C-alpha cells in the first residue's frame, strides 16, 4: 500500500517516518512535482491540483479540521479530485481541547473585566468596577459540530447560560438550541458573547456583518475561532466604534497574515492571535488517520468523511 504526503510547512520527513511506524505494512512518500507514481491514499494540506488530478485513490485526508481550501480549489478545478473519492477531515485530534482552552480563557477574561482593568492600568487609574453576573453573560455558539460541542461542554462547567445555533437542532443538555435562519434572531438577541465556530461554506461567508451584529445586545463581545471570511471586518470595526460591541477577539482574518495597514492592529478593543486557536497535533492526527485507513481496508464504518455538498 502506498501513501503520498504533502504539506507546505510541515516536516515531511518526520511525518513519513511516523506514519510508517503507525502503519508498518505501508510505504509513505513525500509528494513532489512530477511524481505520478500510483498511490492508494493521500494526506494533504493545500495540495497542488496536479498532485491529485487523475489519481485512483481510495481516500484523501485533509491535515486539518477544515476542508475549505480543497473544496474551493475543486470549484475551479473539478478534475482535481473525482467525486467518487472520499474526502476526510481531522475530527478532533487534540483540537477540541485547544478550542476549549481558548474559549474558556477569553470568556473569563471578559467576564472578570480584565480588558477594562488593563485600560485603567494604562491610565494609572485605581478603580474597582462592578462585577458582571453570569445571568447577564449568556454565551452563544454559532456552529454545533465537534468543536462547538466541546466548547459548550467546557463553558457549562463555569455556569454560563449557553445557547447554540446551527443548521439543524441539537439536543445538548443545558444548552438552548436554535436552528436555521428563521431562529437566528432569537439566538442573537440574548447572546452577550458570540463565539463563531461555523464551517466555511457559501452560506456562511460574511455572516457576521452589520445586520447580524445589530441584533446582539449592546456591549456584546465577538470571539472568532472559525474562518476570517465569516466576518465583515469593516462592519465589526463600525460596531466597536458605535458601542454595539464592547470587544472582539480574533484568531482568523479575511487575509492572512493580516496586512500591516489593517486598522484591526491598532484598535484598542480588538485582541488577536495568528490563527493558532487549534493547530494540528501530529501524534493525534496520525493515530486518527492510521485507525481510519485500517477501518477502510477492513470495510468497517468510519467517521470524519466530508459531505462535499454541505462543505463539511
Curated annotation (Swiss-Prot):
Protein family per UniProt: Belongs to the D-isomer specific 2-hydroxyacid dehydrogenase family. GhrA subfamily.
A molecular function GO annotation: NAD binding
Organism: Salmonella arizonae (strain ATCC BAA-731 / CDC346-86 / RSK2980)
GO cellular component: cytoplasm
Catalytic activity: glycolate + NADP(+) = glyoxylate + NADPH + H(+); (R)-glycerate + NAD(+) = 3-hydroxypyruvate + NADH + H(+); (R)-glycerate + NADP(+) = 3-hydroxypyruvate + NADPH + H(+)
EC number assigned by the record: 1.1.1.79, 1.1.1.81
Signal peptide region: none
Top-level EC class as recorded in UniProt: oxidoreductase
Keyword Oxidoreductase: yes
Keywords: Cytoplasm, NAD, NADP, Oxidoreductase
Lineage of origin: Bacteria, Pseudomonadati, Pseudomonadota, Gammaproteobacteria, Enterobacterales
Gene field: ghrA
Domain of life: Bacteria
Catalytic site: 227, 275 (proton donor)
Name by which UniProt lists this protein: Glyoxylate/hydroxypyruvate reductase A
Keyword presence, Cytoplasm: yes
InterPro entries found in the cross-reference section: D-isomer_DH_CS, D-isomer_DH_NAD-bd, GhrA_Enterobacterales, NAD(P)-bd_dom_sf
One Pfam family named in its UniProt record: 2-Hacid_dh_C
PROSITE patterns assigned: D_2_HYDROXYACID_DH_3
Function recorded in the entry: Catalyzes the NADPH-dependent reduction of glyoxylate and hydroxypyruvate into glycolate and glycerate, respectively.
UniProt-annotated location(s): Cytoplasm
Amino acid at each position: 500500500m502506498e501513501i503520498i504526503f504533502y504539506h507546505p510547512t510541515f516536516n515531511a520527513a518526520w511525518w513519513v517516518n511516523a506514519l510508517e511506524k503507525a502503519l508498518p505494512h505501508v510505504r509513505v512518500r513525500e509528494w513532489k512535482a512530477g511524481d505520478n507514481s500510483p498511490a492508494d491514499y493521500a494526506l494533504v494540506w493545500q495540495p497542488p491540483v496536479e498532485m491529485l488530478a487523475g489519481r485512483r485513490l481510495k481516500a484523501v485526508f485533509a491535515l486539518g479540521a477544515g476542508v475549505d481550501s480543497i473544496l474551493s480549489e475543486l470549484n475551479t478545478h473539478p478534475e482535481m479530485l473525482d467525486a467518487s473519492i472520499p474526502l476526510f477531515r481531522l475530527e478532533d485530534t487534540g483540537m477540541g481541547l485547544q478550542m476549549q482552552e481558548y474559549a474558556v480563557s477569553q470568556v473569563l477574561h471578559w467576564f472578570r473585566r480584565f480588558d477594562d482593568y488593563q485600560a485603567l492600568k494604562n491610565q494609572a487609574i485605581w478603580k474597582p468596577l462592578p462585577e458582571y453576573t453570569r445571568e447577564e453573560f449568556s454565551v452563544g455558539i454559532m456552529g454545533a459540530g465537534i468543536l462547538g460541542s466541546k466548547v459548550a461542554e467546557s463553558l457549562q462547567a463555569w455556569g454560563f447560560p449557553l445557547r447554540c445555533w446551527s443548521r439543524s437542532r441539537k439536543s445538548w443538555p443545558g444548552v438552548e438550541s436554535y436552528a436555521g435562519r428563521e431562529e437566528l434572531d432569537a439566538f442573537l438577541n440574548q447572546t452577550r458573547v458570540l463565539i463563531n465556530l461555523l464551517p466555511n461554506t457559501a452560506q456562511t461567508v460574511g455572516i457576521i456583518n452589520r445586520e447580524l451584529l445589530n441584533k446582539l445586545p449592546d456591549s456584546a463581545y465577538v470571539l472568532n475561532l472559525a474562518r476570517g471570511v465569516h466576518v465583515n471586518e469593516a462592519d465589526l470595526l463600525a460596531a466597536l466604534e458605535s458601542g454595539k460591541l464592547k470587544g472582539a477577539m480574533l484568531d482568523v482574518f479575511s487575509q492572512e497574515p493580516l496586512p500591516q495597514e489593517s486598522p484591526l492592529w491598532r484598535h484598542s478593543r480588538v485582541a488577536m492571535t495568528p490563527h493558532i486557536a487549534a493547530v494540528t497535533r501530529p501524534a493525534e492526527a496520525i493515530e486518527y488517520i492510521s485507525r481510519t485507513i485500517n477501518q477502510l481496508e477492513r470495510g468497517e464504518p468510519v467517521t470524519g468523511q466530508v459531505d462535499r455538498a454541505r462543505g463539511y
